[in-house]
Amino acid sequence: KRPNPATAKRLRRNARPRMGDAWAWAGRRIRPATPDGLPVATARSFNRAPGTVRITGGTIKGRKLDVPAGDGVRPTTDRARETLFNVLTNRFRKPGGSSVLAGARVLDAFAGTGAMGLEAWSRGADFVAFVEAQSTHFATLCDNLRAAKLPTDAGTALRNHEGLKTTDRSIDIIIADPPYEQGQALLTALLARQSALWHADTLLVWEHPRGGGTEAGFDGWEPVHQT
């Protein structure tokens, strides 16, 4: 027996994936309680897929990016990245209501393929610094930036975070997806060593293993969104 049109429409709507299927909850941005308090958004890891990944929104939506071969490569899936950037776009706003990504200076701190930073640029970021230490991954990153036709004044690829000192302005959004086995230690060191680049409204997005030690947090930062 075929359902009537109203029932069929309701079934299709209910079958669609919801933001809640990927995120436990999304909170509003909380203003720091102290002058040196800085906001942090944390995101759990999602399943990974090898091969190629695609930009999911913005001016270069659909652009394919290569993924370097190797056991240590774990690019975030397209669906998970789309969910994360939907949260950034819809939940975090500048005074006046524009997206936090609009005109932002972004750090893709452990860039890999560069998908996170390119997604940010595609969706309105003004400048992205991509940092990738592993030589094979760095070569793939540079190939992906060229394929995406990233203008030279809209981004730079670096082999280490010390190169960030050559940037002449502070960072608005840090996107960090470090190696899981030493992720919190690497990120803690980065936040301390490059502290001159962060300002009072810098937003940190950290992807970490499910159930992986976020309780300790980071000195000077407070959570405003967690899944």
Segments from the language model and where they lie:
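Class I S-adenosyl-L-methionine-dependent methyltransferase catalytic core
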Residues: K1-T227
